[in-house]
Design a protein with these regions (language model features):
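Glycine- and aromatic-enriched membrane insertion/assembly motifs of diderm outer-membrane
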Residues: 52-123
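Generic detector of solvent-exposed, compositionally biased contiguous segments
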Residues: 22-34, 89-100, 175-176
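Cleavable N-terminal export/targeting peptides
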Residues: 1-41
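Short beta-strand-initiation
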Residues: 11, 59-61, 176
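Broad structural signal for hydrophobic residues in well-ordered alpha-helices, predominantly aliphatic
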Residues: 14-16, 64, 181
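Outer-membrane beta-barrel transmembrane domain signature
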Residues: 26-56, 82, 107-109, 119-203, ...
Length: 211
């Protein structure tokens, strides 16, 4: 009963965050985070495919994440972005990297995980680029569904984004709120859903394998 109540509180919290963030919307090249606050164990790897639908652009990219140890985790992405420019769809390249450090680990007496993440994404279309530097604070909590490792992990947080480059009208700094769910459908396979809102609103989904 307590687990069900806690899960409902988390879902309500994310709904309030996202509804607040949807108050404004504008074109802004940014990507979903697709990460909980929990860092991978040393030597563990996750790889998967993600899709982001933003305002006037869509991104499709594979990503690999690797546990470095000492609560550190690194992620690398490389894929494609379709951008609507002057009513025409243009295809471009998306590359990115991020580094996550877990500050707090969930345990007895500690109700959640907390981490910080620094990232860099670069979108290149027609020899023009939109580069984004992000700093995120993410918190999450695991809810075990069975005793075999299947679980659901709601997560959310705040992100500071600095956008610049020749593909954007002017350099800009924005604040986003994000919320999502990682659902481990098996011990090695998971589904991710996320909504992110601030200067623009975007949503996305992804699948990952862990090994």
């Amino acid at each position: 009963m307590k687990r069900t109540q806690s899960l409902m509180v988390w879902l309500l919290f994310f709904a309030l965050m996202l509804s607040a963030g949807m108050a404004t919307a504008a074109v802004h090249f940014t990507q979903n985070e697709f990460t909980t606050a929990e860092s991978l164990d040393p030597g563990m790897t996750q790889s998967g495919i993600h899709f982001t639908l933003g305002d006037h652009y869509k991104s499709y990219y594979p990503e690999i994440r690797y546990g470095l140890g000492a609560m550190l985790e690194i992620g690398v992405k490389f894929g494609a972005t379709s951008v609507t420019i002057e009513d025409r769809d243009k295809l471009g390249v998306l590359v990115g990297i991020d580094l996550k450090y877990q500050l707090i680990k969930e345990a007895d007496g500690v109700p959640l995980d907390l981490s910080v993440d620094v990232g860099f994404d670069n979108t290149v279309v027609n020899s023009k680029n939109a580069s984004e530097v992000t700093f995120s604070t993410v918190m999450s909590k695991s809810f075990a569904l069975t005793d075999r490792g299947y679980k659901i992990i709601p997560y959310g947080g705040l992100e500071m984004s600095a956008l610049y480059g020749s593909l954007v009208d002017e350099s800009d700094t924005s604040v986003y709120v994000l919320g999502g769910i990682e659902w481990k459908l098996s011990q090695k396979f998971m589904l991710l859903l996320e909504l992110k809102a601030g200067a623009s609103t975007l949503g996305g989904a992804g699948i990952r394998f862990e090994y």
